[in-house]
Amino acid sequence: MAASALYACTKCTQRYPFEELSQGQQLCKECRIAHPIVKCTYCRSEFQQESKTNTICKKCAQNVKQFGTPKPCQYCNIIAAFIGTKCQRCTNSEKKYGAPQTCEQCKQQCAFDRKEEGRRKVDGKLLCWLCTLSYKRVLQKTKEQRKSLGSSHSNSSSSSLTEKDQHHSKHHHHHHHHHHRHSSGHHKVSSLSPEQEQGLWKQSHKSSAAIQNETPKKKPKLESKPSNGDSSSINQSADSGGTDNFVLISQLKEEVMSLKRLLQQRDQTILEKDKKLTELKADFQYQESNLRTKMNSMEKAHKETVEQLQAKNRELLKQVAALSKGKKFDKSGSVLTSP
């Protein structure tokens, strides 16, 4: 037997069979686990993660170095407004399509009317960028689930045919009628008309939750015979589920970071107020001590002045008393000497 061809992984360049590589980027299983496709924390666009600590894409990393931490966009609320109050995606869409309108899914004022060409991709709905991505992801899942349902029907019909072929050797006449009925029923299941397929596609869009509940019952049959298309579809659905979980984790991390920033700002404000209050208290104590010192010095000077004035007053009183006595002596002497 000829050896099967090996193909190189685009990340580690090691060679693997074609069935073991992913359909899109041709990555091996280890590289898909080590470098998953995640969404950027800021712009929410998908990129291949180089390390577990890297949660933003290269473009946002360059913008962070150049412009600093972004702010939430005033339209879509995505934390990607590096310049001004709007992100680059909303700025370009506003220039091209005009003012934003209300999204039919999230009810935010962040959906841009892309006319018939853009609405045709989302069944005529007016959706914002994030809701459009989630809607397309649901469509992709329903298509993959339809393929898995079709393959499971074909596998079940082929297994039933083999069992009836074994039974055909014993009961030929009975099997002839039974095989005719089974083949006609199988033809009805496998060959649907275009109108029926379109109706099934629309029904799968409307009841995607019911289809998602039915598909886990068919998974063991799919896993028994993996091929490049089936394994890639399973990997894509698993990656999309992991991406949704990572989006939720990223949103929770953003909320935690915003709350931490808010808490730090409040702590900083409290520290500044405490510092200002301490400075005011120190200034008040300094002024109070100065005023007390000044008041004590003034009281001391006042007491000294009063004491000096009292002493001077006593001396003056003594002088007045002495002068009054001298006048009396003078008057009495003049009276005695007169004839």
Swiss-Prot record:
Name residues in a coiled coil: 248-328
State the GO CC annotations: nuclear speck
Stretches with biased composition (Basic residues): 167-189
Residue ranges with Low complexity bias: 148-160
Q: Where in the cell is it found?
A: Nucleus speckle
Q: Which residues carry this modification: Phosphoserine?
A: 22, 148, 193
Sequence positions bearing N-acetylalanine? 2
Q: Please give the superkingdom of this protein's source.
A: Eukaryota
Q: Which Pfam families match?
A: FAM76 (PF16046)
Gene ablation phenotype (knockout): Enlarged spleen with white pulp hypertrophy. Increased population of CD11b+ myeloid cells and decreased population of CD19+ B cells with no changes in CD3+ T cells. Enhanced macrophage- and microglia-mediated inflammation.
Gene Ontology molecular function, alphabetical: RNA binding
Chain segments carrying region Disordered: 144-243
Q: What does this protein do?
A: Negatively regulates the NF-kappa-B-mediated inflammatory pathway by preventing the translocation of HNRNPA2B1 from the nucleus to the cytoplasm. Inhibits the PI3K/Akt/NF-kappa-B pathway-mediated polarization of M1 macrophages by binding to and stabilizing PIK3CD mRNA, resulting in increased levels of PIK3CD protein and increased levels of phosphorylated downstream target AKT which leads to decreased NF-kappa-B signaling.
* UniProt name for this protein: Protein FAM76B
Q: Which organism is it from?
A: Mus musculus
